[in-house]
Amino acid sequence: MASPSALPSLGQDWNYQSLIPTKSTPYFILTLMVMIVAYAWPSSTDSSVKKLPLVNPAGFFSMKQAKQQYRRSAKSILKNARKQYGNQPFRMITDFGEVVILPSEFIDEIRNEPKLSFSGGLEQERTSQLPEFEAFAILSNRSQLLQTVVKKQLTKFLSKVTEPLAQEGAHAVSLNLGESQEWRELALRPAMLDIIARMSSRVFLGEEICKNKEWLDITKEFTVNFTSAMFELSAYPVPLRRFVHWFLPLCKVLRATNSRAKEIIAPVIAKRAEIRRAAQAAGQEVPFFNDALDWLDQEAKAMGVDYRPDAAQLMLSFVAIHTSTDLLGQVILDIAQHPEIVPEVREEIVRELRANGWKKTSLYNMKLLDSIMKESQRRKPIGMAIMRRSVTEDLRLSNGLLLKKGMRIHVDMHRMQDEEVYENPDEWVPKRFLDMRTQAGKEHLSQFVTTSGDHFGFGHGEHACPGRFFASNELKVALCHLLLKYDWKLAPGTAVNPLMRGFSMLSCPTAKVLVQRRENIELDIDSI
């Protein structure tokens, strides 16, 4: 029997008569009842935390309403919960069931807790078992292959990638922004996405593939569609997702993207294998290409881990491109609304690049630019709750709360906008962290790549984002080109507010800016 072309959403009226097999009615009814109960019944929560308030309660057959409330109004739900319950944990129904939300004050207590699992938290969401999300399994795998590659290989390689990043950044910025000295309107997010995709691909796959238009399109499409497909799928209860994913439009797109990625990466791997065989046969040194393809292969062999190279490249591209694109766009939006800071930033960029050229130390010394990036991330992080973890063994917190094995927790990110921590927290203060560097004991904490209990845009503790050091350099290189070569201002009437979807808080995807190439640039940074 042919598969149906589309699956009705759970909000539609189904034509059950057309779906019920006449000879299998008892089995269909049983299956239907299981599906309904699975959809309606809340995820189980141990009685030890039943005393915690549930901030978006759902009764029998009303789970859908609670999840829709979370998807539309997570920010206001969190705000009301803080107001009502103060610094106490509470429960919340999300797309992935019920979770315990811990206030930010608990972040130092749990940051390195071995009974809380990062990979387990991802595995519980059960998407990595589906073919279109196979790349996600690389991130959630307990072997930590991807994280190891970033920590051991990419971070070690940072001093060697600054010049390639600068070269690719110059090309990508010119390609997207043009050379016109007349003001023109620009859709911000697509341009920033392309710039970051090109720069990241230069480091991950080398100069040849980073110019491959099909690969660039794949990485950009995957970055955009992966999160949207997850959001689309999360509207359905977990037990149904293994069935409905076959019918969802964005899931179909992802499966096609995965196939295209394999078609591009497989010949590259085969070609490299042949080069190595030829070198070995000739008694020559076997080449190591020193990019993410070789890093992954090296670490996987050392760990004895099987993996799909194309899936690993997609996930590596996703984690690098998704967050960096978002923050780069947010920084430009913030600067466009505060042009008074631009001359001082340009002065810093020119001073450091003129003195030392495109070096890792030059980027490190751009402390005002560093402060701006950290402030934009503080004011608009990529989410409202962070540090998703699953409890692997019963754990009692300092307040006496017993977290039982199998439960899930998130940490509220409100502390990054708390007036008790930051003065005027709702304002964008570009020198906030630059000034903080002068305070005793806070010079290190004020750096963009440093995580703390007061600023955890990259997470905190053992599982803090290992790629933040690369992201810092990549963003600074991109901003050097964008700010030194171009003038910026908001397009009239453009939207600037973040897009809220559940706990996600994305830089405005429809924002538009006006941009023009500067005529008299203080330093030719393309020839240093």
Identify the meaning behind each predicted range.
Residues 2-145, 454:
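N-terminal membrane-proximal hinge/A-helix region immediately C-terminal to the signal-anchor transmembrane segment
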Residues 71-79, 355-401, 413-414, 420:
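Conserved cytochrome P450 K-helix E-x-x-R motif and the immediately C-terminal K′/meander segment
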Residues 93-98, 104-107, 112-205:
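Charged/polar low-complexity intrinsically disordered regions
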Residues 162-326:
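Cytochrome P450 heme-thiolate monooxygenase catalytic core
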Residues 322-347:
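Classical protein tyrosine phosphatase
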Residues 341, 462, 468-505:
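Cytochrome P450 heme-binding "Cys pocket" and the immediately downstream C-terminal segment
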Residues 411-445:
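Conserved cytochrome P450 K-helix/beta-meander segment immediately N-terminal to the heme-binding cysteine loop
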Residues 435-476, 501:
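Cytochrome P450 heme-thiolate "Cys pocket" and heme-binding signature region
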